[in-house]
């Protein structure tokens, strides 16, 4: 498939978000080292950033080219690459904070958490680029999809909150095995779950139906809403961790109840969905090419009553 010309604004915005977060990570790494070691770390991160920029120069352009299409394949590649590099730098920052037990400066650690909580969910929303999906014409469908994207961003904040528990100062530390398990569990979730969400959007195509995107809600229900409740409960009860976020525990309980109601409603709708409506949906998909031709010729296309029923 030949991609259209890239959206320059989207390419610039993606590059700014990525390189801003990477620059701050590098600043933390360099600042945590002293003497001759600081020069060596500075050279290493500089070489790494140059290599990353070379790759980003091509991938960001490909992402900007597909932003107005129904595909998000290059967006998944860029997300995977970004999180892979970011979490490696974050791991060394976390280990440096852990080794320097005398430095309990709270502001720098809180600033690191704030930076991640803005850049990571922000990049996900930029890669989805909902406002650039011109093929989504109905306001109701776009707002439904926007609500689902908000849940993904909220889940990313939930994961980052658990990771931040490792470098933000607290009275009692966790065992080494627990720290490593928590960090890499969050690492895997950050790598995979947003890619699952992007792949669902990509697989739906131009006839996207947010109510049919059920893979991500199921995975997040198990891996985030349920598992993170147990993680926080164990940290709070067994390890007496005073920094456990009870607000996110409440958020996950509400999310479990909400998703349970959604799954029950979806199951009921599938059972009651008439067979003739399925046939009409297939017929509508087969005529999509003709509808596209009419729209390019300036003929306004009014949504049929059948499509309105199928969107509900």
Swiss-Prot record:
What Gene Ontology cellular-component terms does the record carry? membrane
At the highest ranks, the source species' classification is: Eukaryota, Metazoa, Chordata, Craniata, Vertebrata
Which topology term describes how it sits in the membrane? Multi-pass membrane protein
Q: Which residues form a coiled coil?
A: none
Classification via InterPro entries: CECR6/TMEM121 (IPR032776), TMEM121 (IPR042314)
Q: What compartments host this protein? A: Membrane
| Annotated Pfam families | CECR6_TMEM121
Spans through the membrane: 10-30, 43-63, 74-94, 111-131, 173-193, 219-239
The protein here is known as Transmembrane protein 121
Q: Which superkingdom does the taxonomy of this entry point to? A: Eukaryota
Q: Which organism is it from?
A: Gallus gallus
Q: Briefly state the protein's biological role.
A: May play a role in MAPK signaling.
Family indicated by similarity: Belongs to the TMEM121 family.
């Amino acid at each position: 498939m030949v991609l259209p010309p890239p959206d320059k604004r989207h390419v610039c915005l993606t590059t700014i978000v990525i390189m801003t977060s990477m620059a701050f990570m590098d600043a933390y790494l360099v600042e945590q080292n002293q003497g001759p070691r600081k020069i060596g770390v500075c050279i290493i991160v500089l070489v790494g950033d140059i290599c990353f920029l070379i790759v980003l120069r091509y991938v960001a352009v490909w992402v900007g080219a597909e932003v107005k299409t129904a595909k998000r394949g290059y967006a998944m590649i860029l997300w995977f690459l970004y999180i892979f590099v970011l979490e490696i730098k974050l791991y060394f920052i976390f280990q440096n904070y852990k080794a320097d037990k005398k430095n309990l400066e709270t502001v720098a650690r809180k600033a690191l958490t704030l930076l991640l909580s803005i850049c990571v969910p922000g990049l996900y929303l930029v890669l989805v680029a909902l406002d650039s999906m011109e093929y989504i014409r109905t306001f109701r469908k776009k707002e439904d999809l926007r609500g689902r994207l908000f849940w993904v961003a909220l889940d990313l904040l939930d994961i980052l909150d658990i990771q931040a528990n490792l470098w933000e100062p607290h009275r009692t530390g966790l065992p080494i095995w627990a720290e490593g398990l928590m960090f890499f569990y969050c690492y895997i979730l950050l790598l995979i779950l947003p890619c699952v969400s992007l792949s669902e959007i990509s697989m739906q195509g131009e006839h996207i139906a947010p109510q049919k995107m059920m893979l991500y809600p199921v995975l997040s229900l198990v891996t985030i809403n349920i598992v993170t409740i147990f993680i926080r409960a164990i940290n709070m009860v067994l390890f007496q961790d005073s920094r456990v976020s009870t607000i996110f525990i409440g958020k996950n309980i509400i999310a479990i109840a909400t998703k349970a109601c959604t799954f029950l409603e979806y199951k009921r709708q599938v059972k009651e969905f008439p067979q003739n409506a399925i046939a009409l949906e297939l017929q509508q998909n087969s005529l999509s090419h003709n509808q596209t031709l009419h729209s390019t010729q300036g003929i306004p296309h009014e949504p049929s009553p059948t499509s309105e029923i199928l969107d509900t």
